[in-house]
């Protein structure tokens, strides 16, 4: 566990991944967020540095995990000029966990190589609780030797991890996962909504769904919230639309 790990993007997912690695004995060397208050708060909690620049994260870290929002954010943090993770990046490994376009992962890998660094896709198919518990499902893309270099670290974050292939391939699979994931809740919501309109007992309907072809992972994770009309947001409609757009572009 000699690797020093920096984080860029410490929202709910990134922050919980940092907490998990800290608990596992890793040196979380720096955290950075476009919202400086988020980085400062997490740095205080973990006893680490709230980096004021992207370049500082690279300077203080061996492995940098990025958890940003979209393609534009990736282009910003891996900019060819100005403040950038690529500054002084020789020998570093970047693990990029955002759901972004496969082409951007390929582009970032090329930029990292030009800077003497390595880049790996670390696409996640799980949520906030799993990030904290180290039970993420990870789909990895990029050079196999790079994957092996950080495999132990990835194992602390995940209950299951799979190297899919070269750069871009893991992002393609993640786009398909999210496409299907975004379709399933709509079907379940329509079914439960109609059941409610018909005056059926929703607990009975859900139990029958669970034992038939209507069963799904979404029923397990979201069924009770739908029944109770609990609309607390864990994954925004804007993010779902962005992810579905990535899948649409693949066609």
Language-model regions, residue ranges each:
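NAD(P)+-binding Rossmann beta1-loop-alpha1 motif at the extreme N-terminus of oxidoreductases
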Residues: 1-67, 92-93, 97, 163
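Hydrophobic residues within alpha-helices
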Residues: 17-21, 108, 153, 194
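Rossmann-fold NAD(P) dinucleotide-binding segment
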Residues: 54-118
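Rossmann-fold dinucleotide-binding core
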Residues: 99-182
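Mid-domain beta-loop-alpha active-site segment that forms a flexible
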Residues: 168-190, 194, 236-246
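Small-residue-rich helix-loop
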Residues: 200-212
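Interdomain hinge/lid region at the active-site interface
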Residues: 215-251
